[in-house]
Regions:
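N-terminal secretory signal peptides that target proteins for export/translocation
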Residues: 1-8
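Bacterial N-terminal signal peptides
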Residues: 11-21
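Solvent-exposed alpha-helical segments and adjacent loops
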Residues: 27-731
Length: 731
C-alpha cells in the first residue's frame, strides 16, 4: 500500500469520525433542549387584584371566598397564602378558629389566640397544589364563639376581617400545548386569567396599511374576548416576542426570523416560537394582503370549527351591521330581559340573611335622548324566602350607588295548615312579587351598575333558645325587563365622555362601518400600538369585531366624506389638525403649543421641554354632522400617556368636553363652546327641545302663535257672521 493511499484512508476515517461526532453532539444538544425543565414562575396576587376588598366575616358561622383561574398552559406546583387578619377580642380561643378550604378541601384551621386579638396579625398558610384546578375557590369560614353557654349566633362581637392587602403567591410551571387550532383562543387569551391581556404582534419591515388593518381586526376580536381585563398589543418588526404572539405575513412580506413557507390560499397555523419552544405563535398568512385579511376574518368568524395545526380559509362572507346593532348595548327595538344581561340565571340568585348584592351592568346607547322624560321603565319581579313575621326585611334597589327604591319583604299569607301547596307551573309562583319602577334619566350614564340588595331581619328567640339556620334564598326573576324602545337617538357633541366610556360615535355601528382611522405613519410602532389598543377597546365596548373600519393616511383624511374620523398621534397628525383647526382649543404646530381658552377669550403660544398629550374632539371639516376625535401629543411619551388614561377605568370619568389635557397621570378637561347635534327627533320633539333652551324666544313664539291663532279665529268668525247677514240684506 502506498503512502498516498494510506494518507487518503486515514483522512477519510478522520472526516467520518468528525462528522459522526458533530452529529452526535447535535443530537445531544437537541436532547438536552427537549428534556430541559419547563419554566417555572412565581406570581404574587393581592386580594384586591382578585377583585375583592376587605373580606368581612360576621356571625358564628360566616363565610367569604376568593375565586380565580389557572391558565390552561400552566400548572400550579406551589401556593402560599399570606393573610393579614384582624379579629374580635371577644372570641374564645378554645372554640374559635378560621377554617380555610381550597375547592372544597379543608387545608388549614387557624387558631385565634386572645393575645393577638384586636390588631392586625400576619399568618402564612401553605396550600397543597394538588387541590387546584382550572377554576378555583379559596373559602374562609369563621367558626366563632364568645361564650361557653348560651350564645346569640349573630352577636356583634363575632367578627373577623381579612385585609385586601393579603395575597396569594402561586408557583406555576409551564405546560407544553400541542399545535392545535381547536384550543383557540388559548393560549393567546385564556378566560381563566383575570390579568390584562398582553399579546405581541409581529410584522415584517415594512408593514403595509392593509396588513395593519387586518391585524386591527384581530386586535378587536381579542379585545372583545378580554372584556373587563383590558388588552394591549405591543408591536415588533422582525423581532420575535418573548411570549405567545400573533404573526401577520404575506408571500412578499415575511418576518426574517421565521422560516415561513409561501402560500397560495389564506392560511392559519400555530407554530412554536423559535425564541422559546414552550411559547406559541398564531400565524396569519396569505398570498397577498387580500388573502391575509380573509385569514384573519376566518379566525374571528369561524374559530368554532377550526381544528388541527393549520387550516386554510376557502371563503368568507359577512353582512354589514345596522346602526345600534351592538351586542353589549341594550336594544332600542324591544324590552330586554334581565336574563339576557347575565351569563347564567344563577347570577340573579343569592342566599343568606345578609347576602351580597345582585349586580347588573346596563350599557345604554350613549346618545339615548332622555330629555323631558320621567325615566326608563323597569318591570321587576323577585322571589324570596318569606319571613315568619312582619319585620324590617327589605329589598333595596340602587343605580350607580344612588337609592332608587326600597321594598318591604312581607310574610306569606297564612294557609289552611293542611300541608298542601301548589307546584308552580311556568311563571305561576305565589311567592313572586312584581313591581313597576322608573329609573330617573339623570341617574343614567352610558355604563351603569344596577344593584339589588336583599336584607333579611334575624329574629332572636330568647336566651338559650337560638337555633340558627341561615337557609334564606332570594332571587331576581330573569323575566324582569328594562325597556328603552320608546327613546330616540340624539346627542350634543363634541363630548369626549361618550367616546371614553362607550367609543361613541364610532361604535354606533358595532363593526365600525362608518369609521375611518387615520394612521399618520405605518412604520411608527407607537401609533400602531395605539391603533390596536383602541380597536381592542372598541371590541370590549361593543362585544363585536371591527370588520368594516377604514385605515387612511393624513392625505386621504382630507377627502374622507360621510365618515367619523379617529386620528392617531404623530407629527403628520399634528400638521393635519393644524391645517383644519385654527379655531380649535389646542394645536401642536411647528414645535409650538397653541392653547386657546374660552374664559377669558385668550390665546397663548408656548415652547416647552416636557411631554403633553391630549384628546381633542370637533366637528369634521369634511362633512358636517360628522365627528373627529384626535389623540395628539408632543412626543411618544405623551401618546403613550393618552392611551394609558383611556385604559385606566379610574381616569375615564375625568375625560369629557371637547379637550382633555394629559400631563403624566394628571387629566384636565374643558367644555367646548361650539356644539352640534347628531341623531334624529320627531319634529315636535326637535322644536320643544331647541326652543326650551331659549326661554324668551319660546315665550315670544307662543305669544306670536296665540296672536296668529286669535287673528285667524277672529277672521273666521267675521266671515261666518257676514254669510249669516247676507240673506237678511237680500230681503
Amino acid at each position: 500500500m502506498s503512502e498516498r493511499s494510506m494518507l487518503e484512508k486515514i483522512g477519510c476515517f478522520l472526516a467520518t469520525f468528525v462528522l459522526y461526532a458533530s452529529s452526535a453532539h447535535g443530537d445531544v444538544l437537541r436532547s438536552v433542549q427537549e428534556d430541559a425543565p419547563l419554566p417555572v414562575q412565581e406570581t404574587r396576587i393581592s386580594f384586591a387584584d382578585l377583585g375583592s376588598g376587605a373580606l368581612a366575616l360576621q356571625g358564628a358561622q360566616s363565610t367569604a371566598a376568593l375565586h380565580f383561574g389557572t391558565r390552561k398552559d400552566e400548572a400550579v406546583v406551589g401556593a402560599t397564602l399570606h393573610l393579614r387578619l384582624t379579629y374580635s377580642p371577644a372570641l374564645l380561643p378554645e372554640l374559635s378558629h378560621l377554617r380555610i378550604s381550597v375547592n372544597g378541601q379543608v387545608v388549614a384551621a387557624l387558631p385565634l389566640p386572645r393575645a393577638d386579638a384586636g390588631h392586625e396579625v400576619e399568618r402564612e398558610v401553605v396550600l397543597d397544589p394538588r387541590y387546584f384546578s382550572d377554576y378555583n375557590e379559596i373559602r374562609f369560614d369563621l367558626i366563632a364563639h364568645y361564650s361557653l353557654e348560651c350564645e346569640d349566633p349573630q352577636h356583634s362581637s363575632l367578627w373577623a376581617n381579612l385585609s385586601p392587602s393579603s395575597d396569594l403567591t402561586l408557583t406555576t410551571r409551564a405546560i407544553d400545548l400541542r399545535d392545535e387550532l381547536g384550543l383557540l383562543p388559548v393560549p393567546f387569551f385564556d378566560r381563566r386569567d383575570n390579568g390584562t391581556v398582553v399579546l405581541p404582534m409581529l410584522f415584517a419591515t415594512p408593514a403595509s396599511r392593509e396588513t395593519l388593518r387586518s391585524a386591527g381586526i384581530a386586535a378587536s376580536w381579542f379585545g372583545m374576548l378580554a372584556d373587563y381585563r383590558g388588552a394591549r398589543f405591543p408591536v415588533s418588526f422582525d423581532a420575535l416576542p418573548a411570549q405567545h404572539g400573533l404573526v401577520f405575513a404575506t408571500n412578499d412580506s415575511r418576518p426574517r426570523q421565521l422560516n415561513l413557507p409561501t402560500v397560495d390560499v389564506p392560511t392559519l397555523s400555530i407554530v412554536d416560537n423559535p425564541r422559546d419552544q414552550h411559547l406559541k405563535l398564531l400565524v396569519f398568512q396569505g398570498k397577498d394582503e387580500t388573502q391575509l385579511r380573509q385569514a384573519v376574518e376566518g379566525l374571528v368568524l369561524g374559530n368554532a370549527v377550526l381544528t388541527g395545526a393549520s387550516a386554510t380559509i376557502t371563503e368568507v362572507a359577512h353582512v354589514r351591521r345596522a346602526a345600534y346593532d351592538v351586542p353589549r348595548w341594550l336594544s332600542t327595538e324591544r324590552a330586554v330581559k334581565f336574563g339576557e344581561l347575565v351569563d347564567s340565571a344563577a347570577q340573579l340568585q343569592v342566599a343568606g340573611i345578609a347576602p351580597p348584592p345582585i349586580t347588573l351592568t346596563l350599557r345604554l346607547p350613549p346618545d339615548l335622548f332622555t330629555w323631558n322624560r320621567s325615566g326608563v321603565p323597569v318591570d321587576l319581579h323577585y322571589r324570596y324566602t318569606a319571613p315568619t313575621e312582619r319585620d324590617n326585611s327589605q329589598l333595596t334597589v340602587t343605580v350607580n350607588d344612588q337609592l332608587l327604591r326600597s321594598y318591604r319583604l312581607t310574610p306569606e299569607a297564612q294557609s289552611g295548615g293542611d300541608g298542601r301547596f301548589d307546584v308552580p307551573f311556568l311563571q305561576g309562583d305565589s311567592s313572586r312579587q312584581s313591581r313597576g319602577l322608573v329609573i330617573p334619566a339623570f341617574e343614567l350614564a352610558s355604563t351603569n351598575q344596577m344593584r339589588f340588595q336583599f336584607a333579611m331581619e334575624y329574629h332572636r328567640q330568647g336566651l338559650c333558645r337560638e337555633v340558627f339556620t341561615d337557609d334564606s334564598r332570594e332571587a331576581i326573576d330573569p323575566d324582569s325587563t328594562i325597556d328603552i324602545s320608546s327613546f330616540s337617538h340624539y346627542a350634543a357633541l363634541p363630548n369626549l365622555a361618550l367616546f371614553a366610556d362607550a367609543g361613541y360615535p364610532f361604535t354606533r355601528f358595532a363593526d365600525l362601518g362608518e369609521t375611518a382611522v387615520v394612521l399618520p405613519d405605518a412604520a411608527d410602532p407607537v401609533a400602531v400600538e395605539q391603533l390596536f389598543f383602541l380597536l381592542g377597546r372598541f371590541g370590549r365596548q361593543t362585544g363585536a369585531v371591527s370588520l368594516a373600519y377604514r385605515l387612511l393616511d393624513t392625505q386621504q383624511a382630507l377627502t374622507a366624506e360621510n365618515l367619523d374620523l379617529l386620528i392617531l398621534s404623530g407629527p403628520k397628525s399634528n400638521e393635519l389638525i393644524a391645517h383644519w383647526g385654527q379655531g380649535l382649543p389646542l394645536l401642536f404646530d411647528d414645535g409650538q403649543r397653541r392653547y386657546r381658552d374660552k374664559e377669558p377669550n385668550a390665546e397663548v403660544k408656548v415652547r416647552a421641554s416636557g411631554s403633553l398629550g391630549a384628546l381633542l374632539s370637533f366637528e369634521s371639516p369634511v362633512t358636517s354632522g360628522r365627528t373627529v376625535v384626535a389623540l395628539v401629543g408632543s412626543d411618544d411619551h405623551a401618546a403613550a400617556a393618552v392611551s394609558a388614561a383611556l385604559g385606566d377605568d379610574s381616569k375615564v370619568p375625568l375625560i369629557r368636553g371637547d379637550l382633555t389635557l394629559v400631563r403624566g397621570t394628571d387629566l384636565q378637561s374643558r367644555e367646548g363652546s361650539h356644539v352640534y347635534f347628531v341623531g334624529s327627533l320627531s319634529w315636535w320633539q326637535w322644536l320643544w327641545f331647541h326652543f326650551s333652551r331659549h326661554a324668551l324666544l319660546l315665550t315670544l313664539l307662543c305669544l306670536a302663535t296665540a296672536v296668529a291663532a286669535a287673528l285667524l279665529i277672529y277672521g273666521g268668525l267675521q266671515r261666518l257672521a257676514a254669510r249669516r247677514l247676507e240673506p237678511r240684506a237680500a230681503e
